[in-house]
Amino acid sequence: MTALLTAVGAAFGALLRYCLNCAAAARGTTGFPWGTWCVNTLGCLLAGALAALPLPAAVAALAGPGLCGGLTTYSTFSYETVRLLAERKWTHALGNIGANLAAGVGAAVLGMAAVGWFLR
């Protein structure tokens, strides 16, 4: 049952990622992969918040590795960074690495802290 719940969550996460990437692409291109940055940051925020909640195992599987795992994308982040390097867009590539790392860790900490504050 846990595997099925994780798969359902992942399907919703992937659909949400697709919609957010389409919305970012519709706003125009700047050379920086904003869609991927947005989904990764949002996924880290949600994962941090979920980690701080006392959730039943089934809900944790659905929302954590399911929804957040389907929403975030390390492979696309890596591919886009390599593509930027191949195009000799060094500043964009290094900015992509730094922005994803800083925003992801910061968002996870913020999610955990916010839930912790509300639960006190």
Swiss-Prot record:
The keyword Cell membrane belongs to this UniProt entry's keyword annotation: yes
Biological process annotations from GO: cellular detoxification of fluoride
Amino-acid positions noted as binding Na(+) in the UniProt annotation, renumbered to this chain: G69, T72
MF-aspect GO terms: fluoride channel activity; metal ion binding
Reactions it catalyzes: fluoride(in) = fluoride(out)
Listed InterPro entries: FluC (IPR003691)
Coiled-coil residue windows: none
Protein's membrane topology: Multi-pass membrane protein
Source taxon at top rank: Bacteria
Subcellular location: Cell membrane
Major localisation: membrane
Cystine connections: none
Regions that span the bilayer: 3-23, 42-62, 99-119
Cellular component annotations (GO), alphabetically ordered: plasma membrane
Keywords in alphabetical order: Cell membrane, Ion channel, Ion transport, Membrane, Metal-binding, Sodium, Transmembrane, Transmembrane helix, Transport
Family: Belongs to the fluoride channel Fluc/FEX (TC 1.A.43) family.
Role noted for this protein: Fluoride-specific ion channel. Important for reducing fluoride concentration in the cell, thus reducing its toxicity.
PANTHER family, per the entry: FLUORIDE EXPORT PROTEIN 1-RELATED
Protein name per UniProt: Fluoride-specific ion channel FluC 1
Provenance organism: Thermobifida fusca (strain YX)
